Amino acid sequence: MKLVIVKDYAELSRKAAEMLVSEVKANPKTVLGLATGGTPVGMYRELIKLSQAQSIDYSQASSFNLDEYVGLSSTHPQSYRSYMEENLFNHINIPAEKTHVPVGNTTDHLAECARYEEAIRLAGGIDIQVLGIGNNGHIGFNEPGSPADSLTRVVQLTDSTIEANARYFDSVEQVPTQAVSMGIKTILGAKKVVLLASGEAKAEAVRLMLEEEPTADVPASLLQLHRDVTVIVDQEAASKLTTSILAGTKPSGS
């Protein structure tokens, strides 16, 4: 795992956006794995700026999102489809039919999960997967205890995750209790992974991810099993890392 520590959230967002732009410039048919939540918002903002400034063409690219809430339609304002359209898809020329988000309000979740896995396979797999990290170490909605061989499935959200996401809803009672999420094995199947973490609240999760042995109790630690992971954190998110980990840090700007 390559660790890159940057000054702040703004620099983190720029570096992550630059990585995605580089992928698309090198391979116009790049398959992007995308994340939602608070952390990637700045990255998407920077990605739009870079794409417009450099006339980046996404017409041959495609994307797969990590997850979607169970029970929300794609047009619900808090659905992850709506999030992606607002924060990215409506601002670049990626074809709508090539942007994939799990369907959360289907009547057959098993079939939807199988369909999603097959769609990823038919696309040739994900070239670069963007991740955030939860305070409890979750990636996607793979909560602690998620097995390393898990595929896309319906997951039960923990109370801490529901409470963390309540800020996007009018009340905690409105937050869905389940989600369709790519599994750990699905995520590890990406050719490259870039994980972003910002703020002191993520510092302990970052420490556990990087310093503990891979364990299902800290889903993000299972990324140690992947051959090409870049972890970009700001100084606050890196504040609990030990000297031995920091000794191997890739300097910002290199």
Swiss-Prot record:
Pathway info: Amino-sugar metabolism; N-acetylneuraminate degradation; D-fructose 6-phosphate from N-acetylneuraminate: step 5/5
Name of the protein this chain belongs to: Glucosamine-6-phosphate deaminase
Entry EC number(s): 3.5.99.6
Catalytic activity: alpha-D-glucosamine 6-phosphate + H2O = beta-D-fructose 6-phosphate + NH4(+)
Family per record: Belongs to the glucosamine/galactosamine-6-phosphate isomerase family. NagB subfamily.
Top EC class of this enzyme: hydrolase
Keywords, comma-separated and alphabetical: Carbohydrate metabolism, Hydrolase
InterPro entries the UniProt entry points to: Glc/Gal-6P_isomerase, Glucosamine6P_isomerase, Glucosamine6P_isomerase_CS, NagB/RpiA_transferase-like
Function comment: Catalyzes the reversible isomerization-deamination of glucosamine 6-phosphate (GlcN6P) to form fructose 6-phosphate (Fru6P) and ammonium ion.
Gene Ontology CC terms, in alphabetical order: cytoplasm
